[in-house]
Amino acid sequence: MGYQVITPPTEPVTLADARLHLRVTDTAEDALIGVWITAAREACEHYTQRSIGSQTLELRLDEFPDGAIDLPRSPVTAITSLKYIDTNGTEQTLAPSAYTLDTFSHTSWVIRAHGTEWPGTLDAANVVRVVYVAGAATPPATVKAAMLLTIGHLYENRESIVIGQTAVELPLGVKALLDTVRVWAL
């Protein structure tokens, strides 16, 4: 089981936003700042377990679960396709009428339609493939603020170790901002 990003999002923090936050007026470090923008988004996604910005993902499973399919990186906005390899080794597409997307819960789930069972699959790895779109087109301001704080940290601290200084985490820093949208383990 695993998932991967098929189409990454447009970064919610633009290069102009980051430069303004960093108080940088020249373009000499644009490539580096661009790397930090992506790194900040990915760190926010990892911490919150949510997709930041609209993106297409693919989840692969070795078989259908007994219950619902838990889709990583909510909020899921659409299922593009749900395909599987049947017991004869033939790829099939499950009709949308055979399942429902639950977007109301804290995480997103694909649930079998009432009175149905998941189909049988070939006994092999990655035989169930769910392609879906996740993430809000416009992330909350708290996420953008957390990204800007992270970008600022990376800009000011270009090494993994700082000698001769005391580090203090801001009480209303990145984690406090991201906790407002984080998926907490149940």
Segments (PLM) and residue ranges:
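Divalent metal-cofactor coordination and adjacent catalytic microenvironments
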Residues: M1-L186
